[in-house]
Design a protein with these regions (language model features):
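C-terminal amphipathic helix plus adjacent low-complexity
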Residues: 196-220
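Membrane-proximal helix-turn-helix segments that form the acceptor-binding/catalytic region
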Residues: 146-163
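N-terminal subdomain of nucleotide-sugar transferases
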Residues: 1-56, 205-206
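Active-site proximal beta-strand in glycosyltransferases
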Residues: 111-114, 124-142
Length: 220
């Protein structure tokens, strides 16, 4: 099985969560690649299977967003994206879209697994590949502050073939405030799995991605 892991946090530092998950997935026989914001403006050398989204040049237009990119954490990026101007957000989306598309073309993943519900979840859906999203409560809080972001994140989550919530409170919020019963019939609703993210989540990621792929194939 081929998986593309997308994180809203820095992806090119060896001790990051996405790196640990990728390594553990490969031990399970999965061909795993990774995509996410880069900690530097350009990678010093190409790392096979790693697709860094270089946002530093775009972020230079906003001190707040530049600090978030330099910070490298998912929450910093998501919070900054909810506050930047529509024009800058458009530039960020286009930059990220190109790299996500490149990662998909290069690795031909069976499923995309996205850490956090945000702009990259939306772009993953656009590729047409089955998508699983891992949602934390903070993702929903941040997206809820911006009308455009809430609209995009809501549509993205509803379009996913698999949904994982960090905890029961997040799952409840998703069901009550983000996933409308009118969108799908009961038979089409995607069940929400609950488990917290960790660098050792490889087996859980593989299981939920296998279910998502089966669900997509069944509906096809």
């Amino acid at each position: 099985m081929r998986l593309l892991l997308i994180d809203h946090g820095c992806c090119d530092v060896p001790d990051t969560r996405v790196h640990h998950c990728r390594e553990h997935l490969e031990k399970l026989g999965v061909q795993a690649s990774a995509c996410g914001p880069s900690s530097i403006s350009h990678l010093a050398s190409h790392q096979p299977g790693l697709h860094g989204i270089h946002l530093h040049d775009v972020a230079a237009a906003s001190k707040l967003f530049l600090r978030a990119v330099q910070d490298g954490t998912p929450i910093a990026l998501l919070e900054a994206l909810a506050t930047i101007s529509p024009s800058l957000l458009g530039l960020v989306r286009e930059t990220a879209r190109q790299m996500v598309a490149e990662a998909v073309d290069a690795n031909l993943p069976d499923v995309i697994f996205v850490f956090h519900a945000g702009i990259l979840t939306d772009l993953a859906i656009e590729t047409g590949v089955p998508v699983v999203v891992h949602v934390s409560f903070s993702d929903l809080v941040v997206a809820g502050r911006n009308g455009f972001m809430r609209q995009r994140v809501t549509a993205a989550i509803a379009s996913c073939n698999g949904i994982v919530a960090t905890d029961a409170d997040t799952a409840q919020a998703l069901r009550q405030e983000w996933l409308s019963d009118d969108v799908h019939s009961p038979d089409e609703q995607v069940p929400i799995v609950i488990w917290p993210p960790s660098p050792n989540s490889a087996a859980d990621i593989l299981a939920v991605c296998q279910c998502a792929l089966s669900r997509r194939q069944y509906r096809a």
